[in-house]
Amino acid sequence: MVLQTDQTPDPRQLAIIAEQLGRAPRGIEAVAAVDGEGTPLVLRMAPIVDGKPFPTLYWLSCTRLKVVISRLEASGVIKQLETRLQEDPDFLAAYHASHHDYVDARWHHMRDAQRREVAHLGYEEVLTRRGIGGIANWDQVRCLHTQYAHHLCGDNVIGQWMDAEHGVVDCLP
């Protein structure tokens, strides 16, 4: 089960996240999604971390999901998806819509002070043109982890496909 939360992490969640990442988290704004036991699955990140744009709005933190998705990547699924994007105009259009959803969410979650910082640092164009996980070419798939993190928090056709074809969500409690 996946619950979208978008809440500031509590001390228990911060400890779990540090264990998941192998370090203390930097740039985390919220726990965006948890599983049925309340374990963080996805973190929502700040748009600027250490004075630079952070390309990933949604960060997949769940160890279980990372393992399952890494196996999919190792099996060559990204190449399969990119072939489908080239051959299926409807799938490509849905994928472009996923990128737009991601960019819109990035700007929606920015506070006024963050928007001013983004403008001051000259990163408005980068954070508007870069899609899921910071990818520039919206016809390619870079990382299934970022696709799936977005799927759990937004509208992502790749994540939907991963659930339909590979049952990724079924690994969660």
Residue ranges and their predicted role:
Residues 1-46, 50:
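Short N-terminal edge-element motif at the start of the domain
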Residues 65-122:
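An exposed acidic His-Trp-rich patch
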Residues 34-88:
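Aromatic- and glycine-enriched beta-alpha-beta binding-site module
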Residues 107-173:
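C-terminal charged interaction modules
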Residues 14, 74-78, 141:
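Alpha-helix initiation and N-capping motif
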